[in-house]
């Protein structure tokens, strides 16, 4: 298995400098990761640097809390795509999901899907560590209904990250035709393999190089 092609090589720390981001971009070129996942401010740079390389430009929307308005998320999506993003990872409105406001949650996702239609993949971060199993299932069902391409476990900025159990539950819920992304706490090749075995079709990690080289010593998970 070519694990590199399943990895979104991630740098989302708020204090990331241009030098930090360029390092991630160069590593993505070298190891041929599926994408670089960066904050929106770096999308234009990444798109320019990765032109001609088989590496997608992924960014985050409504990140990390998911509590911005639907209109803001849709605008962020259009703006990111205009600057060169080919994948967007949006955060659901977790509070609305917990309130049982399915209509709001679905519309929130749907508007981002529409803003990205035909131009970028949409991954929906459900923030599993804050949800009950019933809420995880509902979040996945609403994501599929809204037309998302992927569901994703975590931002990496909350109380926990991906678990194999959550990946299995999400895969069971969305079926074979929607992607499942494991992110948060995936630091080693063993971690990544466990997620893929449980049903993940993509892995988000900042320790991507260590995962590919199978080097536990080099692994950190500082998004």
Swiss-Prot record:
Its main location: cytoplasm. CDD domains: DeoC. It holds the Pfam family DeoC. It comes from the Bacteria. Signal peptide: none annotated. It is found in: Cytoplasm. The active site is at residues 89, 152, 181. Its EC number is 4.1.2.4. The keyword Transport does not apply. One of its GO terms (biological process) is carbohydrate catabolic process. This is Deoxyribose-phosphate aldolase. The gene is deoC.
């Amino acid at each position: 298995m070519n694990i590199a092609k399943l990895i979104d090589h991630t740098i989302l720390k708020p204090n990331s400098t241009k030098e930090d981001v360029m390092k991630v971009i160069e590593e993505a070129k070298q190891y041929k990761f599926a994408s670089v996942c960066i904050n929106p401010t770096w999308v234009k740079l990444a798109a320019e640097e990765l032109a001609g390389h088989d590496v997608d430009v992924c960014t985050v929307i409504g990140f990390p809390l998911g509590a911005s308005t639907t209109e803001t998320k849709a605008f962020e999506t259009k703006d990111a795509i205009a600057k060169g993003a080919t994948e967007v990872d949006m955060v659901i409105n977790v509070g609305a999901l917990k309130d049982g406001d399915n209509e709001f949650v679905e519309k929130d996702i749907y508007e981002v899907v529409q803003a990205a239609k035909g131009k970028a993949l949409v991954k929906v971060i459900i923030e599993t560590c804050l949800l009950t199993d019933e809420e995880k299932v509902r979040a996945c069902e609403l994501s599929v209904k809204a037309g998302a391409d992927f569901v994703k476990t975590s931002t990496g900025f909350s109380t926990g990250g991906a678990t194999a159990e959550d990946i299995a539950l999400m895969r069971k819920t969305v079926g074979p035709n929607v992607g499942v992304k494991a992110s948060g706490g995936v630091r080693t090749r063993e971690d990544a393999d466990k997620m893929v075995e449980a049903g993940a079709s993509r892995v988000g990690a900042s320790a991507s190089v260590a995962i590919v080289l199978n080097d536990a010593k080099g692994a950190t998970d500082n998004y």
